[in-house]
């Protein structure tokens, strides 16, 4: 199963139109008052070794920017994020990514508010967020559509899961 551990989704708009995917990039999972967000930045093909990715200064720096942005956003909401010191390797299909799971206790938090605070991560939009989004809009001659949009679900207990991005 190539997408084990991915944020999997299916959205059926009507009988003729469905949107499904399996993104390795989980923007937010909220279960029983516990948040998890997956920082995923720094990518290499399967032909490279995991050690080369873990030791790549460029990829580690990019990855740490994403980790720091997510933890800063969670702190700004009054939460106390926890994370491992070093990233792990996550394999998805033909790619390997640097991956850091970030967790926090989040009693009485609204999933849509949390997702809105975290989206877009620097892995999607860049840094600083507002300037990067403006720069991308001025350069890109196409609409990203659903590519950079989070997608997910919320249940009646307030638990949820949202992918950071997908493709149409």
Language model features: what each stretch is:
Residues 125-131, 135-168:
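Glycine-rich, small/acidic residue-mixed loop/short-helix segments
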Residues 13-19, 70-71, 87-95, 150-156:
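A glycine-rich phosphate-binding loop feature that marks nucleotide/adenosyl-phosphate handling sites
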Residues 36-137:
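Contiguous alpha-helical scaffold segments within structured protein domains
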Residues 1-60, 65, 81, 158-168:
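An anion-binding catalytic pocket shared by soluble metabolic enzymes
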Residues 15, 120, 143-146:
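N-terminal hydrophobic or amphipathic segments with adjacent small-residue motifs
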